[in-house]
Amino acid sequence: MHLLIAAAGSGRRMGATRNKLLLPLSGQPVLAWTLQAALEAESIHWIGIIGQEIDRSEILTLVEGAPKPVAWITGGDSRQESVSRGLAGLPDTAQHVLIHDGARCLASPHLFNRCSDAVRSGKAVIAATPVTDTIKRVDASGLITATPNRAELWAAQTPQAFSVDELRQGHREAHACGWTVTDDASLYERLGWPVNVLDAGPSNIKVTTPFDLTVAAAVLAERLG
């Protein structure tokens, strides 16, 4: 299985002046935990790291001596463009691909393997978790306009797993039509293609704020004993 890791994270919401994935977390950079899980996942045979050139040397230091092939792919100005470049950088033999946010540093090897198994069976899948809060739809003035049925709501996460040919087609359509999406599953939705959810459990958080770092450190402390 081929894995693309989006690693061009901004530090803006962290109050940091550098890539948040290079901030320390329990003794090593955030991204190192993501890479460790990917390298331990039996299903993953090739990893592409999509990042910005300014971070290239520091990120590649994290995978020196890695037991699997790891390639560097220079990203674009948006996540969508970066993933498109990542798809262009896949080996010719790639049939399926997992897309993963480097900031989801608590993803387990088992989660990568589950997503890999699902996409090999012919399903496009995304890691997700059922929403537990009551969600409100709110207009521009701050007025609540609706309360969606919580039973139908899931928070989309990564890894997201797809056919390489289909996902490339989705990105071509997005470019041609001017679509802007925040995850790759949205391209499938626009094209009317089915995507399934795979329950990732409660710990597959995305590290975005200082509070998220605190939560991630607590989860890692529990895992590591």
Curated annotation (Swiss-Prot):
Pfam families, A to Z: IspD
Pathway of action: Isoprenoid biosynthesis; isopentenyl diphosphate biosynthesis via DXP pathway; isopentenyl diphosphate from 1-deoxy-D-xylulose 5-phosphate: step 2/6
Keywords: Isoprene biosynthesis, Nucleotidyltransferase, Transferase
Positions MEP for the nucleophilic attack (site feature) positions: 150, 206
Biological process (GO), any one: isopentenyl diphosphate biosynthetic process, methylerythritol 4-phosphate pathway
Lineage: superkingdom: Bacteria
SUPFAM superfamilies: Nucleotide-diphospho-sugar transferases
Annotated InterPro entries: IspD, IspD/TarI, IspD/TarI_cytidylyltransf_bact, ISPD_synthase_CS, Nucleotide-diphossugar_trans
Name of the top EC class for this enzyme: transferase
CDD domains the UniProt entry points to: CDP-ME_synthetase
EC number: 2.7.7.60
Gene3D superfamilies linked: Spore Coat Polysaccharide Biosynthesis Protein SpsA, Chain A
Catalytic activity as recorded in UniProt: 2-C-methyl-D-erythritol 4-phosphate + CTP + H(+) = 4-CDP-2-C-methyl-D-erythritol + diphosphate
PROSITE patterns in the record: ISPD
Role played: Catalyzes the formation of 4-diphosphocytidyl-2-C-methyl-D-erythritol from CTP and 2-C-methyl-D-erythritol 4-phosphate (MEP).
Family statement: Belongs to the IspD/TarI cytidylyltransferase family. IspD subfamily.
PANTHER family: 2-C-METHYL-D-ERYTHRITOL 4-PHOSPHATE CYTIDYLYLTRANSFERASE, CHLOROPLASTIC (PTHR32125:SF4)
Protein name (database record): 2-C-methyl-D-erythritol 4-phosphate cytidylyltransferase
Organism in which the protein naturally occurs: Synechococcus sp. (strain CC9311)
